[in-house]
């Protein structure tokens, strides 16, 4: 049984895709042990609680300095004995000691086809604004292992999505979530569960 922690900062739509995929059997032999958010108002915490999953808020604002926050975040994952850490819209820089502790056991979803529109500053709608400004015809999503760089870890899976001439950043974001992110993240977790 693969035990996972899902780290998320906002609405938790990728978290919901994972929860639903476990419920309907697209992800097997996997249990979400905890959902951790840095944002006490994150809807993801509600989604977790509704699904009967432990939901924890660990915010940098709760700690005197960043090192104390980093230690608390790592400890929160460690004490739950997880095998895989899933970053599903986690808008906090992951501590280097956590990356080292979970080397090749931490994955992230990014809303573009890496190496395009990734790295520092490319998150949320910024990614889709950049894609539209550049005039690309295809965008998509990538699941990758996390390393010390920003969106630089080894790619596990990608899925392309058509960019339409009348797209707005919001419309493109939604299409990439529905057609790519919510599909490939569950597939990758299931692959890892059976590796």
Regions found by a protein language model. Name each.
Residues 1-195:
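One-carbon transfer enzymes
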């Amino acid at each position: 049984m693969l035990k996972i922690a899902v780290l998320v900062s906002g609405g938790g739509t990728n978290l919901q895709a994972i929860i639903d995929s476990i419920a309907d059997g697209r992800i097997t032999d996997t249990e979400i042990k905890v959902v951790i958010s840095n944002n006490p108002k994150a809807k993801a915490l509600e989604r977790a609680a509704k699904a009967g999953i432990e939901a924890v808020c660990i915010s940098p604002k709760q700690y005197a300095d960043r090192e104390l926050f980093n230690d608390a975040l790592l400890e929160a994952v460690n004490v739950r004995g997880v095998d895989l850490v899933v970053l599903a819209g986690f808008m906090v820089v992951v501590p280097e000691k956590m990356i080292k502790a979970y080397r090749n056991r931490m994955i992230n979803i990014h809303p573009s086809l890496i190496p395009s529109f990734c790295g520092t500053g490319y998150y949320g709608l910024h990614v889709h604004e950049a894609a539209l400004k550049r005039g690309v015809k295809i965008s998509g999503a990538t699941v990758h292992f996390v390393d010390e760089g920003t969106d630089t870890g080894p790619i596990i899976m990608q899925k392309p999505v058509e960019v339409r001439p009348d797209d707005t950043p919001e419309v493109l974001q939604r299409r990439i979530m529905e057609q790519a992110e919510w599909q490939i993240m569950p597939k990758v977790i299931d692959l890892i569960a059976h590796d």
